Amino acid sequence: MTQPAFFKQPPPLTLVEIAASTGAQLIDASRGEQRITGLASLDQAGPMHLTFFDNHKYAAQLAATRAGACFVSPRFEASVPGHVAVLRSAAPFRAFVRIARDCHADTLRPQSWFDNATIAASAVVHPSAHLEDAVVVDPLAVIGPGVEIGTGSVIGSGAVIGPGVRIGRNCNVGAGTTIQVALIGNNVLIHPGCHIGQDGYGFIFFGSEGHVKVPQTGRVLIQNDVEIGAGTTIDRGSLRDTVIGEGTKIDNQVQIGHNVTIGRRCLLAAQIGLAGSLTIGDNVALGAKVGINNHLHIGDGAQVVAMSGVKDDIPPNGRWGGYFAKPTRQWYRELFAVERLARDGAPNAGSATPDPTDRGA
C-alpha cells in the first residue's frame, strides 16, 4: 500500500481507464466508472484499491480481500469474491505493474532527497569539471577535476566522483557512492553506497617479499540502461577493463572483481561474488549468493541456482546448481540418491555406543 508520507498519491482512475491502459477485460461493464485511488496487496487492499492475483498460494487472501478491483487470469476468475471487480488478464502481475509504473513514475529512479533542482551550495565542483544543463548535485557531493556529467543526471548527497570520470545523460548516482576510473553510459541507475572503480584484488601471493600488489590500470565501463543495487562494489580492471553490459540489472551487495565482463541484459541477485577475469554472456541469470571462480566463461542464456558455487565453465543456456555447481538434472538426481540412502540405510547407522574413555582431543 502506498504511504503518502513518502510517495505521491496518484490521481484516481476509473476501471475503464485501467482496462484500456493494460489491455485487460473488465468483466462487469456496469462498473466501468468505479474509481480506484491506490494500489495494494490482497491482504491490505480496501474498497478503493486495485490489486492482483496470480499465485494459488494466496487463495485464502483472495477469498478474504476487501479490494475494489483485481487483475486475475481466467483460470482463477471464479475464485474472486463477488464484491471485487474482475479485470481479466493473461498476465495479472504484468498488468498491475503497468498501472503501478504509470501511477508512481517518480519512484522508478532516485530523485534528489532535498527537492534540489540545481547544484547545492555545499557541493564541491572542480572548476575543470563539465556539467551539462539540468544536472542536479545534492549537498556535500564532490565532483573532481575533468569530470563530465550529462544533462538530467542526479548526483546524490555525499557522493564522490573522481578525476576524469564520465557519466552520461539521465543517470542517478545514489548518496554516499564513490566512482573513480570509470566511464558510464546513459540512463544508468546507481543506488546509494556503491563503490565503483577501486583497485581490484590483485597480488602475487606468498613470495619472498610477501604479498606483492599488482598495479590495476584498467577501467570500469558501464553501458546504457544498467541498474546497480545499493552497496555493490565493482573493481576496475588490471590490464583490461571491467565491463557491465547494456541493460544488465544488479541487485544489492554484489562484488564484481577486476577484468570481469558481464554481457547484455543479465540479472544478478543479491550477494553474488564474481572473481576476477570472469566472462559472462548475454541474458544470464544468477541467483542470490552465487559464487563464481576466476577465468571462467558463462555462456549466453545460462542460469545458476541461488547459493551455488561455480568452478567450471557453463555452456550456453545451461541450467546449473549446487556446490560445486553442475547441470541441475544431475544435481537433483544426486540429491535424491543421497536422500534415499539416508532414508533406506541401516536403522542403527551412525548410532554406535560412544567409548566412555574417549575424552576428545
Curated annotation (Swiss-Prot):
What SUPFAM superfamilies does the entry give?
Answer: Trimeric LpxA-like enzymes
**Species in which this protein is naturally found:** Nitrobacter hamburgensis (strain DSM 10229 / NCIMB 13809 / X14)
State the pathway, as annotated in the record: Bacterial outer membrane biogenesis; LPS lipid A biosynthesis
Query: What does the subunit comment say?
Result: Homotrimer.
Any GO molecular function: N-acyltransferase activity
Q: What's the Enzyme Commission number for this chain?
A: 2.3.1.191
Q: Is the keyword Repeat in the record?
A: yes
The protein's role, per its UniProt record: Catalyzes the N-acylation of UDP-3-O-acylglucosamine using 3-hydroxyacyl-ACP as the acyl donor. Is involved in the biosynthesis of lipid A, a phosphorylated glycolipid that anchors the lipopolysaccharide to the outer membrane of the cell.
Its name, as the record gives it, is UDP-3-O-acylglucosamine N-acyltransferase
The record's HAMAP family line, in alphabetical order, gives: LpxD
Q: What is one GO cellular-component annotation here?
A: membrane
> Key word Cell division present in the record?
no
InterPro entries, from UniProt?
Hexapep (IPR001451), LpxD (IPR007691), Trimer_LpxA-like_sf (IPR011004), UDP_GlcNAc_AcTrfase_non-rep (IPR020573)
Top-level taxon of the source organism: Bacteria
Keywords from the UniProt entry: Acyltransferase, Lipid A biosynthesis, Lipid biosynthesis, Lipid metabolism, Repeat, Transferase
Q: Where are the transmembrane segments?
A: none
Q: Where is the active site?
A: 258
